Amino acid sequence: MKSPYQGKPEEKWLAITKRLINKHPLKDEIVDVVLQSWEDIFNSRIGSYSIGKEIFPEPQMMGFFLHELVAQNLALKYPKVYKRGDAKKEKDIHNTEDPSLGIEIKTSSNKDKIFANRSYAQPSSDSEKKDKNGYYLAINFEKFSKKGRKPRIRLIRFGFLEHEDWIPQKSEKGQQAHLSDLAYKTKLITLYQAE
């Protein structure tokens, strides 16, 4: 897929991102689906125990639940168009009619940053793997605290990212990648921010 930013000056990237988001069919629903999915976690039970009352999962587990529920809730609402991506070529939220509208989901308990596997900073090298370029849903949430307050969704952003936007850890043993400051400024749009 050709980059929508290729050959365009950086000062135009934000406008390009806004255009890409405006043409996405889920742009008006993403916030509601994410917030409902977050509530679904706290309405869940594991055995006889409730999440947030007797069980307090670590951030990685909360991110996993959120990641899964957002995709499942969209698949439930639009069963002929969306499904949870389950093949190596499919995005986390797979659009069966137009795969270019699929969405990768990244969650983090960091205040405002998201992270990915180091491989996201490399171009897709073979046709057996999913394209790392495309729409991304970035969700930041609070961890459980000792104060007992229910954690909240901090930030929901939607945008269009490419492998060049990810910066791998410098250490060769490092397995993580983070986004460039330019990507945060021009390629992710804030849809929701907790007060």
Where are the regions that the model predicts?
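Active-site beta-strand-loop-beta-strand hairpin of nuclease catalytic cores
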Residues: Q72, H94-G102
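Nucleic-acid endonuclease domains
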Residues: M1-K91, T107-E195
